[in-house]
Amino acid sequence: MQSNLLKVLGVLAIVATLVCFIFAALGMIGAVRVGNGCYMRYSKDGNGSTDSITSTITLNANANYVNISKMLPDGTTKLIPDPNRYGEWLNTQVLVEKNQSVNLQVVGQVSLCLAYLPKNNLQFTERTRPGKSNLDDSGQMIPIPRVQDANSPPISLIMDAKNNEWRNIAELYANDKVLVSVSPNFANTDATVDDVFKGVKVTKDCTQGKTSYYPICGKYSIYSGKYVTACELKQNYWKGNVHREECYCVFGCIYKEDSDPWVCDMANAASHCCTSLVCDSLPAWINHYSNMPEAYKDDGSFTFSWSDKSKNLLIEYEDLQCSNNVNIPPNGQCPDIVNNRSPKDKNYIGGVSCTSGICKDGDFQKNRKFWYTADGKGGKGPTGLIYQMNDIGSVSQALPSKLEFAKFVPETEQPPEYKDKNGKYLYKVIYNIPFNSNIEKSYLQYRLWSPTSQDASKNTGGYVLNIKQTKCYRENGNSFKDIFDDRGRVQYIIVKSSENPNTSGKTYSPQGINVDSDGKSHFNANESGYIWMKILNDPSNNLKDYKDSEGSYKVHFSTSLKVGSFTIKVMNPLLQLFKTKVQDAATSIFKNMVCYKATDNSSCTNFFTYIKAILILYVMTYGAMFLLGFAKINQKELVIRIAKIGVVSGLINGNTFEFFNNYLFDAITNFSDSIIANMSGYSLFTSTNTISNPFMFLDAIMSKIFFSQTFIAQLLSLLSLGLSGIIYFIITFIAICIVIITTLRAIAVYIMAFMATCILIGIAPLFISFLLFDFTRYLFDNWVRFTIRYMIEPVVMMAGIIVLTQLFTIYLDFVLGYSVCWKCTLPIKIPFIGTILPIALLNVPIFCINWFAPWGMDYMSGMMGVNMQNIVALVIIAYGMYGYVEFSGRMVAKLTSAAGPSATQIGGRMSHDAGQKVLSQIGMDYRTRQGITGRAKSRLEQRNRTLEHAEQNSKKYKKRIGENTNEETLK
């Protein structure tokens, strides 16, 4: 036994070493982080019979998980998504059973479609560019970069001040994010803007001192024509102050009603002198004009400050006049066409202290404003820029009663990438409010403020607005309708392990996951298999929305998977089938021997006939011997012989089978099961209250070994403990293999004992009849001994296995009693870094190999040790279990004094042959190993013979050389 065990241990050590190398190779693959799933030692309810599994997967918005290499023009390569793999399901690697509860939380943000420039935008409308207002010169739609894309600049739209109408900058659906910014006022420099329609850069001169500018300069003016810049006092400018001419009548004037009221009489020389009206020549302040707008100055002297009140953004220059009615020139008559040319705004325009000449020192000179700038003259926003939301996106000129003036968002909300290296703004955000509305769709519109009554075609300049938009934005797994129903819902299907829904060609029925505001949800698996997931999106138009999608979700799984029962899944089906077949075979043997209820006796032999003949022969022989005096009988012998005759004659009864089947058969065959179940404290009863499986005590340990994902992860995590972990793994792996082999041997012994017991009971009528004669009595006695032996042998064997199994379970929990996570376990660092690079770079890993590792272990703080004494105890217990199986067989043989084959020997041979069959697949069975060692031995012997032959030839050669040398010396 010891030699066989050593051989088995050697084979297991080799297998364990090979497994280590295999997992080392897998560890290199593990350098790529595939998740952070954890296998918890206990579930949340503290139940150790379940695997508490946590896992995290990354769910891509584009549903593409395959990258290919693309050659760039500069000769380098870049990984890009495979263009043929969009919209695919992702295997989460979470295995569930039917009705298993799964908790999950979806975290992250995705954009499930790409925003494009809308029609009737700031730069072109359908009137100015029919059918192509949203297309570039090549006829393609113009994509808008996403808000979170810090590496892509926004697209720029040129707002011409000549367009005094509302135009669209963005088409918004529910939850869309938008970032509108304004380009700065380019002062004393050139401005350069990308024209997204032409695909070229536009550069214009924006230096000060000009009265007209291109829209990209960041300034505009609504003023044109002439305005009053100074007032001049013009003497004798007009005739006013009307009065009558002085009368020189000698005798005075007389009053006549039929003519002028006052006249001179005919006697006076000056006729009608009193009827003439005369005017004085009066001065007036006249206007001095200049053209609007005044040339722009960078010092802001002609620039409006930002205001959210339109009255502060307009100066009515035509209302400013040096004097009343100054726009009506004098007609040179008396009186003038107007009678009031008094000063009006002269003091404001020319100044109070100026009383003659050209006056231009009034406060007006400092308050002249003509220009609106994108920087708002240091104000809160771009001056004169207004916005509104419009549900249909139509172009219009009407101004609402309340104007919304654009403002700069707070400094803390300005993206850092919108500044240059000197901290100067390239773009300044004026709108960043997500679109949250009950309206399905709306348009964000902008225009430059100007009076609606004014001819905007005379305006000059403009602004440049820049737009980023994240369309179809969803977060934490929430979904709602835009142009596609339920876009963004996380869906799942449960597929068998052998299927791939992306290639199977089958039609599946995805289930949608309803999450709360935090992205949490719960569902029960509708079938068994692996969970596959993807984010619902519009599959039309050749998966365009999937291809345009960006972002990902982190899906955190938490589920408790009941560990598969070794008893229910393996032992019950095996034993129930085997025991049923064996019991049926045994009862068939019994029935065929007695032809029980047989209508056709040709298929059976009625053993009752032989028993009757034997019984008659026995009575006749013994009676004749008694009458002839050859046999002496006393009372004891008489009772014994009568009892024998009674027992044997009882077999002749037609109800013999019912008696054996109802009372003796089950009692004898289930004797071992009852004792084993009572000893272990575990039992599994059928509907008839009979014990169907005596191996319930193995359920915990074997279920853990064969069906627990947590246990497999715990075992593999030993490899993460360094070189000592490899030793721990090999020793633990060998111990577990020994326990598995021992368990299989025990099951084989039980099966053989049960089968032997059933067969012996089945042929009971034959051996009971051997009770009559002394020369056949030994056959009956041996039958009884072997029946009892096969009934007791499993009991004695299981008694020790039960105790050792419980000990093994305890120590296995000592060794592997921790939760496990997939994480960084083996950091790869540059060797000798301290002698080459600064000490600051010490202990900095280049990359890390991920593998299963105990919960809480940090590779930076050192490895976690395992108590070696527990591992040694584990091996000792496993070795004891292996040896006890054979030991129990010998014990039972001594107890029952039954020489011959035992169930232990037969079961051992069965397990040995099964093991050799498995090992033969990898060339490690006994015959192959014997062949290898035989061939190696043969080669070694051949080598030794060759060396001996070479040595002999060498000696002969040296001897011959010596002889020749001696001969030459003698000569």
Curated annotation (Swiss-Prot):
Protein name: Uncharacterized protein RP106
Span of the signal peptide: 1-24
Location in or out of the cell: Cell membrane
Regions of compositional bias (Basic and acidic residues) in chain numbering: 938-954
Keywords, ordered alphabetically: Cell membrane, Membrane, Signal, Transmembrane, Transmembrane helix
Transmembrane segments: 611-631, 721-741, 753-773, 795-815, 832-852, 865-885
Record-linked InterPro entries: Conjugal_tfr_TrbL/VirB6 (IPR007688)
GO BP: any one term: protein secretion by the type IV secretion system
Keyword Transmembrane recorded: yes
